[in-house]
Amino acid sequence: MCLCAHTSRAQEELDDLLEGFEDELEEIITDQPSDAGPGLWELTGDLSVSASYAYAHTHSDPIKREYRGLAALRTQLRLQLDLNLPRDWRARVSGRGFYDSAYRIQGRRNFTDEALDTSEDELEFQEIWLQGSLLPQLDLKFGRQIVNWGRSETIRVIDVLNPLDNREPGLVDIEDLRLPVVMTKLDYYHGPWTLTGIAVHETRFDENPDFGSEFFPIAVPPPPENTPGNGGSNTEWAAALTGIFSGWDVSLHWARFFDDTAHLELVPAAIGPPRPQLEHARLTMLGASGNYAMGNWLLKAEAAYFDGLEYFVLAGDDKTRWDIMGGLEYAGFDDTTISLDVVRRHISGFDSRLENDPDFVENNRVETAFRYTTEFMNSRLRATYLATIFGTPFDGGGFMRLSCDYELRDALTVGGGIVLYMGGDFPTFEANRKNDRLFFTAKYSF
């Protein structure tokens, strides 16, 4: 359109000089190509190969011998189709599939059926949504999508709407772990404020390590899990009010959702004594968050109140919890970002029995995350150090990751690094303290 307007103005200015050639000039201008707008559709994706080598398991380890050495050799294809529809509406369909050859190389008979079912191969749709404006100030987005409420890159407080893929903890960042769910999201805009209402129709929980997988902490299978159905009375609800201003922003949040962390219950059996079963409590969250930019510094804060927490040893006695997170991010060095986030989770009316099997929770749980990211060679090489540690003073366990990614050319990236797991007071970290690994990735994007 800019080209056409410019051409029109030029034609008017030259009319007096070209009076005898109006028809010829008009024909020439008409035949010139104009700037094309966005196409109706765009298909993108990537093909990647990743491998990890677990070097810390010894021949004397009584468990996880099958994961010694080559722990993963995964080939993955991801595709994303974006559609540009009339009236500025958009749609997306994306999915992925992978196959992990390490299980066949190491011998499939050495692994449990549960581990093979969830980790050897997978084919699934990811984001599938339709988005557009119903009114000038009202937008709709419906379908499988991701809504990130959090301010931290590593720690979750108010970011409760999407479950996580926790099957291989520590290898990638949270932004690559979120799992989309089917939602209806309405956004109403008024000046700097946005009012959001969300209905979550799909019941989906964290994908955790299955029995027999490398990161499953015990040698016996878990009890059966009760997963609520989709929609109806199981619909999850959420709302947010967000204000974005010069140098700072603030938001208020509310959600009524299922706890991703299941608790153990004894449920009546048709015959005989009650049987154990994993259940998901219905929680209510009230939260607030904000960012404040000050020169090269970014201050981050999140706070949330959770009601309805259930535990095995306190059957019928729901608990509440306060999560408060503060963070700093500094970007004053060239091509470098440093961040530190700390969260404290406090259970009100704590009972010391909760510290024991099978609940394993503490009255006050502290989580600290430190991240250092720097770039070299005109941003073609990126190095990241990440440490996430639990407890005070850092006695709960955690992990450290050092990784590098190098862009060989525009569409081809290779990378690798090391992940070190630290044991501690938390049983899960203590069980996985020998899962240290080297990893490598190669990805071609198109």
What do the PLM-derived regions correspond to, one by one?
Residues 8-90, 94, 102-103, 117, ...:
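N-terminal periplasmic/intermembrane-space "pro-region" immediately following the signal or transit peptide
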Residues 45-53, 93-97, 142-144, 197-201, ...:
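Transmembrane beta-barrel strands of outer-membrane/channel proteins
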Residues 73-79, 123-128, 180-184, 235-239, ...:
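Hydrophobic, lipid-facing positions within transmembrane beta-strands of outer-membrane proteins
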Residues 87-216, 246, 423:
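Outer membrane beta-barrel
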Residues 88-91, 137-140, 192-195, 247-250, ...:
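Repeated loop/turn-to-beta-strand initiation elements of outer-membrane beta-barrel proteins
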Residues 190, 420, 432-446:
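Outer-membrane beta-barrel "beta-signal"
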Residues 255, 291-311, 315-389:
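Detector for outer-membrane/organellar transmembrane beta-barrel domains
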